[in-house]
Every structure is written in C-alpha cells, then in structure tokens.
C-alpha cells in the first residue's frame, strides 16, 4: 500500500465510483493530484484486475489498460498469466456464479464488504489456456461490436431528433 504520493501525482486514481457496475468500464477518474489523495492506495498495472470489496452486489470489476493507484476499498488482483488469462478471470469475477458465491459472505448491513480470503476461496473452473485465450478473444470481439452498435444507435438517434426538429419543430 502506498502512503507517500510523491512521484505519483500524475497517476490516474481509480476510486470505487470510477468503476461502472456490471461492465467494469472505468469512467470519470482523475489524477492523484486532482483528487487530493491523502489515504493509502494500491498500485495497479495493466496486468491487474481491480475488484471492489465494498458493496459486492454492484459487481464492480475493472480490467485497466494503464498503470495507476486504486482505492483501498478495492483489491488489485495480479493474475498468474501462466495458468489463467486475465480477461477470463475478470469475466468470471463478474459472473452470476461468482456473484452468488461472494454475496453469501456479504453480511454487513450498511456497507456490505468482502475480505480477501473470501475472494481467494472461490473455486474457479480453469480450462486449458488455449480455451481461456479463445474466450478472451471472443469477448474482445463482442465488446468491439457492442461499441460499434452503440455508436450507430447514437448516430441514428441524433439523425432522428434532427429530422423531428426540422419537420415538426
């Protein structure tokens, strides 16, 4: 855990609020300096998965593609790449199977929280690496398609709105 932020001022700061629920998309984050960070943070790299340990029902699991510091309310999980594909593990941590497992431990009323041993206690189905890699490639393609479709939907809505304004406005 890092407590002295000298040299880290320009690093992205990923708070739990910067991780979109269900998708893990990183949104609205700022730098360590911009946020005026004073409490301890964890260093993460593109090799890590960021798993939110508070309010596990929100299913906040991010796969960053940059280096930064994350909230102490998250676990930066470093994947052993010789036995597990990072994208495969990330999607498993977002799965209903894992969510059902982890919610059974979430026993605090005001701010549900899970501990590291509970996360590590999950028995992950681990197919051969080539199958995990195929899965990760497929998921990346699906994500690219989703982005392209969303862009088309946004453009179509914009066109529709402008036509409505032109004809009925």
Q: Model segments located where?
A:
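Hydrophobic residues in beta-strands and at strand termini
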Residues: 16, 63-64, 79, 124-126
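A short glycine-rich beta-alpha junction/loop motif
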Residues: 54, 68-75, 107-133
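Sequence-specific dsDNA recognition surfaces
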Residues: 1-4, 11-46, 65
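Generic structural signal for secondary-structure transition and capping sites
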Residues: 1-2, 98, 161
């Amino acid at each position: 855990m890092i407590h002295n932020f000298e040299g880290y001022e320009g690093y992205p700061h990923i708070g739990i609020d910067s991780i979109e629920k269900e998708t893990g998309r990183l949104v609205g984050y700022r730098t360590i300096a911009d946020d005026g960070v004073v409490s301890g943070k964890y260093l993460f790299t593109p090799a890590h998965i960021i798993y939110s340990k508070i309010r596990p029902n929100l299913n906040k699991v991010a796969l960053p593609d940059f280096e930064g510091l994350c909230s102490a309310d998250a676990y930066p999980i470093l994947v052993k790449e010789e036995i597990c594909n990072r994208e495969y593990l990330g999607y498993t941590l977002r799965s209903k199977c894992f969510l059902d497992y982890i919610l059974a431990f979430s026993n605090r009323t005001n701010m549900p929280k899970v501990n590291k041993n509970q996360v590590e206690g999950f028995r992950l189905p681990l197919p051969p690496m080539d199958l995990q890699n195929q899965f990760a490639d497929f998921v990346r393609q699906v994500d690219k398609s989703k982005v392209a479709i969303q862009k088309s939907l946004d453009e179509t809505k914009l066109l529709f709105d402008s036509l409505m304004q032109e004809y009925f406005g």
